Amino acid sequence: MNPSSPPSSRSVPIAACFDLAQDYDRAARVQARTATALADRIAKRYASSAPPARILELGCGTGALTRKLSALFPNAEITAIDLSPGMIARAREAVPGVIYYVMDAEHPELTGPFDLICSSFCIQWFNDRAAAFRRLAHLLTPGGRLEVTTLAQGSFAQWREACEAEGLPCGFPDYPALSQLSADYPTSLQGIWEGETKRDPVGTARRFLQDLRTIGATTPREGSRALTSTQLRRVMQHFDRMTNEMDYRIAYGSAVRTRGVFVTGTDTGIGKTLVSAIVTKALDATYWKPFQTGLSDEAGDTASVTTLAELPSSRVIPPAYAFLAPLSPQDAAALEGREVDPTALTLPESDRTLVVEGAGGLMVPLNSDTLLVDWAATLDLPVILVCRSGLGTINHTLLSIEALRQRNMAIAGVVMSGTPNPANRAAIAHFGRVPVLAEIPHLDEVTPQHITRQAEILRDALHRAGF
């Protein structure tokens, strides 16, 4: 960890602007109201659950949100970072007992995991939100929360209208729509964005611009050209004739780091267990196969994954149901006079990512009422779909993808098993609109060493998905 990490090239002028913002709190009216609203939302998220033990705040500024976090969670270890040394100094004075670093929030060099990462009015300064969200997901504990606000499409509408009316360009950044913000979440973050308009009584154009300078928010859109003094005067006069208020469109993002992944397949016997071992190794995860059949013929998938991924017993959760016959869970249970009750099953507690392996394909019946896919949908885990690489795989894989999407299940990607087939891979990626995470070739011998090598390859693809 570097407590004073070098900022990116675009961050340098941003930090300089905020360092000069001596009267920030007086002018940051909307920022203060938004920090209060975000704190209220965070309090509601934790009203019926355990409070976060470790919190990371991005872009803490002078400590408006930091103060509220400290009051909400007095026993938490709070780390707050900001690009501006001046802002950090003021926050440290206002809210003692917090760990402060001068650091680029888009590239935090910190050791996780954190239970809560939050930020108010920081991520609009990021160069690459999607990449930043992936990095933040890596810092969250499984089940941890991301709670942020940012400016969204529709902000400063009155100023933009005045510029357009005068036929002049607006130098303000183009803020994203809620749909774009949602698309920026990696698969490992599942959540929503909600919008709210806050109207600020700025009075006049001059006061509005002065307040922006006061809070240091003067970095223009990249590539924009500054207005001449005459042009700026025209826009200000038009604004004053039109209104004395300014709209801030606020986006509230709330997401949870998924607790793991669900590994399933287009059929039985296609390599789900092999892929589960590889994924478990790649993510340093805990493994669980809730429904195990066929124990009359073999030791079972739990034993195989334990050996191949070299797992200690603490990272292996025994099956909830284990049956002798190599049949569907419904039929295997019936032969033993039993019945599977999936409603009684919830995800086991684990401080690691969980890899949950299914039984057979998606449409395997668990009992007379429930298919495997319907139970899996209740877990809120993104899916890794294992398919064959050869003839027939396009149809089977696309049908499985369609079944997952009908149930609003997130798909982390597809892993193909067998002799690599570039045409089939391209068709599945194109028509399925999913990433192909890896192609696992046929292995004459499967050993822990083979699993380790394949895990190193798959780890990069999973990392790009936020795991």
Model-assigned labels for residue ranges:
Residues 29-51:
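Conserved alpha-helix/loop element of class I SAM-dependent methyltransferases that forms part
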Residues 54-108:
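Class I SAM-dependent methyltransferase SAM/SAH-binding core
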Residues 106-117:
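A short acidic, Gly/Pro-enriched loop at the edge of an enzyme's catalytic core
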Residues 192-258:
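Conserved Class I S-adenosyl-L-methionine
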Residues 145-205, 218-226:
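Conserved catalytic/acceptor-binding region of the Class I
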